[in-house]
Amino acid sequence: MALARAASGQAVTLVPPDGPLAAQTAALVKADQFEAIHLVVPEGREIAEHAVEGPITLFCLEGEAEIGLPDGRVTLAAGQWLYLDGGVPHSVYGTRASRLLLTIVLLAAPGT
């Protein structure tokens, strides 16, 4: 079941009480100030190291993922939340099949 983009004021079920779970990464909303993404990381899959300009948060909805950081790795299990400053290089590895809620703060370009 694919997740559709959310409209302002619309409730979205990210963790259904039963039935099939969303199995693919999908942008939930992208506004001028932030973007929210339902991120699916299969077991054994790695998202290579990268960085984004603005701060991010990762909330583990299901499974377990390792976040690679310059100073080591942090394990996120279901129910755990992580904040990263903008520009921090990081990778994501699915130690178990995982679903994460990724929020990215979008910084305005200078002069806009």
What are these regions (language model features)?
Residues 1-33:
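A short, N-terminal "cap"/entry segment at the start of jelly-roll beta-barrel domains
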Residues 64-66, 73, 89, 99:
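Structural motif
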Residues 61-62, 77-78, 96:
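A cytosolic small-molecule/anion-sensing beta-strand core signal
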Residues 86-110:
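Ligand-binding loop in jelly-roll beta-barrel domains
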Residues 40-42, 52-66:
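Short, conserved beta-strand element in jelly-roll/cupin
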Residues 71-87:
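Short acidic-glycine-tyrosine-enriched beta hairpin
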Residues 47-49, 67-68, 84, 89-95:
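Short beta-strand His + acidic residue motifs that chelate non-heme Fe in jelly-roll/DSBH
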Residues 22, 35-52:
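Conserved short histidine dyad/triad with adjacent acidic residue
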